[in-house]
Structure formats: C-alpha cells, structure tokens
Amino acid sequence: MKLHVRNRKCIRHISFRNMKAAKTRNIIAILAISLTAILFTSIFTVAMSIVYGYEQSNFRQAGGYSHGHFKFLTKEQAEELREDPLIKEWGMRRFLGVPYDAPFQKSHVEISYVDENYAKWCFLEPVKGRLPKEGTNEAAADTTVLALLGIEPEIGAEFTMTFDVDGTETTETFTLCGYWDFDQVSPANHVLLPESRVQEILTKTNWQGLDGMTGFYSL
C-alpha cells in the first residue's frame, strides 16, 4: 500500500520539531556512530601495521623479498633463466668470497657483485652514495663492516680487506662509494663490488670454482 502525502511541508516541520526536542539524544547518537567508525578504522590500521611489520621482519631475516631465488648458477644458466618469459623481473648476484681473520671472526661478511634490482630486493641499497661503477675499485658496504675496519662512513674513504676466494687468500683495497645501516636481523654483512672487479680478483686468484659457490651467479 502506498500513501500519497500532499502536505510535505507540514511533515517536514513536524520532523524538525521532533529533532529539536531530542537534540541531546541525536548528538549522542551521532557521536556514537562517529566514535564507532573511528574505532574500527583504528583497529584495521593497527592490524595492517602489525601484518606489514611481521612480513618485513620475515623478509629481512630471509635476506630478501623476491618471489623466488636460484643460487649458484653458471653464467649460461643465469642468462637462460633471465630470458624465460615467465620471469617478469630479475636481479643478479655474483659471489666472490668471505673474510675469516680479524676483525671478522665473529661476523659473517659476504663480498660479491649485485645489480640494482638485487640490491633493492635484498635491502642492500646505499642510503648514502651509490652502488659501485664498473671498471673501478669502488665498493659499497654496510656500516658494521666499516666499523669493524675502523673506517668512518665517508664517501671516498679507502679501506683494505683480506678475504678468502675459493681457498685462496687475497688482500684488496677499495674506495667507498656508498653505505647503508646494517639490519640486526639480516643473516649476513655485505661488501658490494662491480662485476669487473669481481672478475679481476677471480682471475688473479686462479679461480677454479671448486667450492660450487665462488664465482657463480644467483638470480
């Protein structure tokens, strides 16, 4: 049944009078609705923040947030995977070596080449400076490595490291081109070199790839 009301002005007037008569009640109702909306928004925001923080912590402990990881590939295998149409984006790393002697006995430090994508996805982007350029002796490192070496984090500073390359010890000097704060949940400290310098050191140390890691690529 549908009623047709002709005197809408009268009904509107009565409605306004009713609202004025219950002004306090209406204000309380509006406040209650507003506070409820704010409460649910706050709960949702806090929940999303907790989930995001948990995910980021897991990513940092794992060493990165890419969808997949192929380790210790030959150059040919890495190039074949890069061209696979199912891989939307990729980042590259080439492992060089690790230092064992003082001052790194209690720290796991990895020396390697990484490209921009790999650095981004594995939380290795310099907050000051940049990644090293090819054809130079530049290096980027986290602040913990620099502190252990007694080096102030200043772009252009030179530092020397002795490290193992597939069973052969070598001592190399680098020029700092970038650095970032070390994350305490990260599984390793890092020193990043240009791939040209990595290849130069591999050649110098007569690299054979016997350990299955040194000189190989990760994607």
What residues fall within each predicted segment?
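N-terminal Sec/SRP start-transfer signal
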Residues: 1-38
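Generic secondary-structure boundary/loop-capping signal
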Residues: 11, 37, 41, 121-124, ...
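Alpha-helical transmembrane segments
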Residues: 21, 25-27, 35-63
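Basic-flanked hydrophobic alpha-helices used for secretion and membrane insertion
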Residues: 48-219
